[in-house]
Amino acid sequence: MAKDKDVRPIIKLKSTAGTGYTYVTRKNRRNDPDRMVLKKYDPRIRKHVEFREER
């Protein structure tokens, strides 16, 4: 049974390029309490762009 306050929740990372492309990953709430921002590859525009955590 999953808890609401899980230590490692599943999050979606959405492209800031506006393509709607997403990555799904997990994060540790204790180490990263703020919203995650990662630079990853967006295959729709064939570039590396920032992906931001959406809730």
Curated annotation (Swiss-Prot):
UniProt signal peptide: none
Molecular functions per Gene Ontology: structural constituent of ribosome
Example of a GO cellular component annotation carried by this entry: cytosolic large ribosomal subunit
Pfam families xref list: Ribosomal_L33
Keywords attached to this entry: Ribonucleoprotein, Ribosomal protein
Entries under InterPro entries matching the protein: Ribosomal_bL33, Ribosomal_bL33_CS, Ribosomal_bL33_sf, Ribosomal_zn-bd
Any one GO BP annotation for this protein: translation
HAMAP family from the UniProt entry: Ribosomal_bL33
Protein family (similarity comment): Belongs to the bacterial ribosomal protein bL33 family.
This protein's name: Large ribosomal subunit protein bL33
Species for this entry: Arthrobacter sp. (strain FB24)
